[in-house]
Structures are given as C-alpha cells and as structure tokens.
Amino acid sequence: MIPHTRGHPPEHALRAPGAAGTLIAVSPILFLVAAAHFFNDIYMGFFTPLFPIVMEKFGLTLSMVGAISMVTALASALSQPLFGMLFDRFGVTASLYLAPLLTAILVSFVGVIPSYPLFLAALFLGCLGSAAFHPKGASVTPTLSGSHPEIGMAIFSAGGNLGFAAGPAVIAFFISAWGFHSTPVLAVPAALVAGALFLLLPARELKARTAPAVRVTWKGLFANREDRAVLLRLVFINFCLTVAVRGLGTFLPVYMAKLSMPLTSIGVLFTVMLALGAAISVFVSSLSRRTGKRVLVLISVAAGAPLAVGGYLFFPGAAGSILIVLAGTVLTFSNPLLILMAQRHSGDSPAMASSLIMGFSWGLAGLAMVPLGGIGELIGLPGMMVIVGAFPLLAVLSCLRLPRG
C-alpha cells in the first residue's frame, strides 16, 4: 500500500499536464529529496573509473576488485532491509539529510587512504550511510507526489540515477585536473544539500503521513501469500538486471584500462549511459499508466540482455559503445516501476519493501561480482562479460508471472 497525500496538494505544488489531461501535483520538497538522492549516489558512482587506479595502486587481482563490489553490496545494499524496518516502525526522517552527509565525508577521502584494508573500511562505512537514505527516501516519495506516484518515484529515482551517472565523469575529470589526493574537496556539495534539507524538510508532517498503522515486522511483510510471491519475483527480477548493470560497471572499466583507454573516456561512457537511463525512466514511468508496469519490466529484461551481449561482442568500437549505452539505459529504466510494484504489495511496510528492491537484490548482485571475477580470470574478461550481459534473461519467466496493470 502506497501512502498518498490526503486532501489538497501542497499550496506551492508544481503542476503540469498529465498523460490523460489531468494535473500532476508534486511538492517542491520532492525535488530537494531527489537532490539529496543525487548527491547520495554520486559518491557511489565514483568507483567505476577508480577500479583501474585502485587496482594498480594496491596491486589487486580481478577477484579483489570484485571484493570491492561485494563490500559495497554488504554495506549499502544488504543492510537496507534493516534500515527499512527501522524507518517503517519509527518514522525516522533525519536519515534524509544525515545519510548523504556521512556518505560524502567517508567516500570523498578515498584519494588519501594509504592501504587496501583501510580503503575497504571507509567504503563499508560510507556505503552504510548511502543505505540509510534509500528506504526512507523511497517511502516518503509517494506522499510528496500527489495523485501520480509513478511520476514522483521516477523523479526520485532519476535523482539517484543521475548522481550515479555523474559520478564517473566527475571523479575522472577531477582526478585528471587536481590529482587523486584532492578528492576530500568533493564532500562540500553534499554538505550544502544536507544543510538545506535539515532547514526545510517538514519532518513531523512526513513522519505522520508515512507512519504505519501496525507494528512492522518481516512476518507481517510476507504474511499475504500472493503478495509474498510477487515480492520474491520482483527481487529476483531486479537481481538479474542488477548483475548485468553492476558487472558492466565493475569489469568493463578494467577491460577499457587494459585497452589503454583514458580515464576520462571510461567516465564519459558510464555517465552518458546512466544519465540517459535516468531521463528515459521518467518517460517510461509516465507511460506505465497506459501500458501497465509488467510489459515495460519485461521489455527491460528481454531487450536489455541482447543489447548488452552485442555491446560486449563489438567492443571496443563505436558500435559496441552505442550498444552498451543502450543496454544500460534499457536495463535501468524499469527500476522505479519495480519499487512501486513492491510498495503496492507491502501492506504497511513501504520502506522495507523499497529496500528489498533498492538494497537487498542489489546487494545479492554485488555478492555475485566475486565469483564473476574468478570466472573472468579463468576464461578471460570478454567471455565473462558476455555471461554477465545475458544474465537478465533468467528473469523472463518471472516477468510473465507478475500481475497485470
């Protein structure tokens, strides 16, 4: 069940024509929350172009590079259901500004960390901050979205996707201009947004609107058999999609570095791919009101995999780069739809349901990076990346079994 704004939309709501001639009322606070999502996730996007640098600096193997993704998964993803249960039960809103601040401070110091163990420790703690933001951000978004939660969730998701997209280019150009040791400066923008949220966020109002009617528990979330089946399918679908996306983000930069491609090229490729996916997700979320969500999720799975495999087969080269950008776009545009579908089958636990999609399934995909790195060492990076690209096809049957609408 998604909590909706009751009564009239906020006085200063943004109004725009809807798909069916209706009006979309979105609270301006939603854009501030989306901005926090942008800066929360921009730091997570730093690591894509940094993998080759860190690999050389600390003398890492492919499996050890995969371990970085595993640490990210454990901290920022698998912990999200715990944060989701906490926020559903107590309605904590301070995480919307404290979490991005913690992430910014810890992750921005990667350039001055002297050892691999300390690097992993800082990454782990910084990713915990990122994890604390997502469940609450996703659960308050429908409340701030008026009568069109699909549009609101797309705006919220686009903030994170654009941040994750900007991360590779920002860190690549920053390091090229000022050096790896200057990265602590990058914590400043997130601190400013956190301060704005602290001053402007209507914390009491949001806490009241999103408070559950009953005590939130894991047992309660999975009490309904039909809802449980849908949630498990959604988790599996997002897991398969995320294996492809995380595999692309983890290992393709290493492959590009082996081909002597510059750091800025790596950053630009991933920024274009993720930014396009964020933009398309807003359109797709609006379109879902006409087509239903299931068909668009199926397109994301069934079309994204062939594009990814084709991109790997033709890379490097213009055709391969274009296919990879298209693959990343198609694989990620269904994320807001999956979150909303999970919330609608969550009872009184929207934050916990959101965390299953944004965190738990993402984390499981991160754990898969270590064995995939081992496979790459055995059969080579190109062969392993083809396997990664085809992975979403495992979710086709689960897509077909989702409820219509």
Model-derived regions, located:
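Helix-to-loop junctions at the C-terminal end of transmembrane segments
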Residues: 79-91, 280-292, 376-377
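Juxtamembrane intracellular "pre-TM" segments in multi-pass secondary transporters
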Residues: 12-24, 205-234
